[in-house]
From Swiss-Prot:
Gene: NS
Biased composition (Basic residues): 217-237
General function of this protein: Inhibits post-transcriptional processing of cellular pre-mRNA, by binding and inhibiting two cellular proteins that are required for the 3'-end processing of cellular pre-mRNAs: the 30 kDa cleavage and polyadenylation specificity factor/CPSF4 and the poly(A)-binding protein 2/PABPN1. In turn, unprocessed 3' end pre-mRNAs accumulate in the host nucleus and are no longer exported to the cytoplasm. Cellular protein synthesis is thereby shut off very early after virus infection.
Protein name (record): Non-structural protein 1
Biological source species: Influenza A virus (strain A/Udorn/307/1972 H3N2)
Keywords of this entry: Eukaryotic host gene expression shutoff by virus, Host cytoplasm, Host gene expression shutoff by virus, Host mRNA suppression by virus, Host nucleus, Host-virus interaction, Inhibition of host innate immune response by virus, Inhibition of host interferon signaling pathway by virus, Inhibition of host PKR by virus, Inhibition of host pre-mRNA processing by virus, Inhibition of host RIG-I by virus, Inhibition of host RLR pathway by virus, Interferon antiviral system evasion, RNA-binding, Ubl conjugation, Viral immunoevasion
Amino acid sequence: MDSNTVSSFQVDCFLWHVRKQVVDQELGDAPFLDRLRRDQKSLRGRGSTLGLNIEAATHVGKQIVEKILKEESDEALKMTMASTPASRYITDMTIEELSRDWFMLMPKQKVEGPLCIRIDQAIMDKNIMLKANFSVIFDRLETLILLRAFTEEGAIVGEISPLPSFPGHTIEDVKNAIGVLIGGLEWNDNTVRVSKTLQRFAWGSSNENGRPPLTPKQKRKMARTARSKVRRDKMAD
């Protein structure tokens, strides 16, 4: 096992512990608490994958951080902070929409890279909006926290979330997963739109029809899906 992988996990465990203390003292806002909960799941998955105990890793992580801080000068810290771009937290969803439990009548789940896609295949002929909470850096999507698909009535019918055991994903991972989710929902004649906020930070532009540009791979897949559906309809006739 790579030593850097282990030390990174140990430091992440300790930093999570520090952030938890901030929340316990009621100093964290809603986005801070949301990231804390999701990072907890990620750490559990990484700990299981690495075969490391989180409590023991936290203690070692504390020692690593204390050693770094002891050697770090105030001037170096100022320079580091000045040269590091700050990320922003973008919220399409309210806290209620973000934390609400939902159930699928005909569940389908697919893993696309480091992201998990869940779709309720029982949903048909609905107008659906995709909304997401995510962080942004340099005006581009950095990290997806959670994406959900909502009907006009407010029901949740689909979701994209990071896999706890596979930390880290790219903007292309997110766009590919969105393409898969759209294709799955449109299979049942649903009309899917993507929020302007998500379009702007993921694709760099927004369309009035709510449809982001598809990759060549997604276009080919949707064309195959359409041909298959036409053949199925002809057989039914």
